[in-house]
């Protein structure tokens, strides 16, 4: 039976969501990605969030949680959020190894649910855009059919759609070759369902807020390394790691804000030419 997570939403109340993405953790906590210790940057982000953790009703982790595909990396992710009271749901990114991801996160009590009902007004659907072994994304026929079924059976619910890969160009040609390859097929499905108003992704390690045929498309900074916007070639940014908060309101509106660490201690090796 398909796993469904249900969250209450009373009256005109809002549901507050924390998005964490692209943590790129390793089995060994001392390891670094492009000069940034990803465990330490993840911990710093969580410490910045922790004073406000009681405000969140749900945590969404939108892929690339591990860099080395190890079970230990996913255990470290779970360790980081263990003190947060909000449930967490997740989806895979191109760097993730799903068997280890599923097993380690489930063992840690993190839900494998790919559908979340929020009161009577909202649903969140989590898609798997991973094509294992390559950086670009694609939604399988199964995923597209699953999406269409879930949208059709809840037409009264405002819908937030989550996936790892960005379906629209971000303006970085080196990144955009690794986007969602069959975004047109996704658009065809979504065109049938006007209650899908928002999409949220990770992958591009930078903030993005675009209109996609009347839908709002959001992307969020990584908790570690940042990619510099509007660059044709691989370029790292020196801006601090970040995360996103979102509020879903009973009337179908969404408000959101990107947050970043206040200091600049997590500086990448800007001479790096890729990873």
UniProtKB/Swiss-Prot annotation:
It holds the Pfam family Metallophos. Hydrolyzes cAMP to 5'-AMP. Plays an important regulatory role in modulating the intracellular concentration of cAMP, thereby influencing cAMP-dependent processes. Specific for cAMP. GO terms for molecular function: 3',5'-cyclic-AMP phosphodiesterase activity; ferrous iron binding; nucleotide binding. InterPro entries: Calcineurin-like_PHP_ApaH, cAMP_phosphodiest_CpdA, CNP_phosphodiesterase-III, GpdQ/CpdA-like, Metallo-depent_PP-like. Its cofactor is Fe(2+). It catalyses: 3',5'-cyclic AMP + H2O = AMP + H(+). Keywords: cAMP, Hydrolase, Iron, Metal-binding, Nucleotide-binding. PANTHER family: CYCLIC NUCLEOTIDE PHOSPHODIESTERASE CBUA0032-RELATED (PTHR42988:SF2), PHOSPHOHYDROLASE (PTHR42988). Binds 2 Fe(2+) ions per subunit. Belongs to the cyclic nucleotide phosphodiesterase class-III family. It comes from the Bacteria. AMP binds at residues 24, 64, 94-95, 205. SUPFAM superfamilies: Metallo-dependent phosphatases. Fe cation 2 binds at residues 64, 94, 164, 203. NCBIfam families: PRK11148.1 (NF008359). Its EC number is 3.1.4.53. Fe cation 1 binds at residues 22, 24, 64, 205. The keyword Zinc-finger does not apply. This is 3',5'-cyclic adenosine monophosphate phosphodiesterase CpdA. Transmembrane segments: none annotated. The keyword Secreted does not apply.
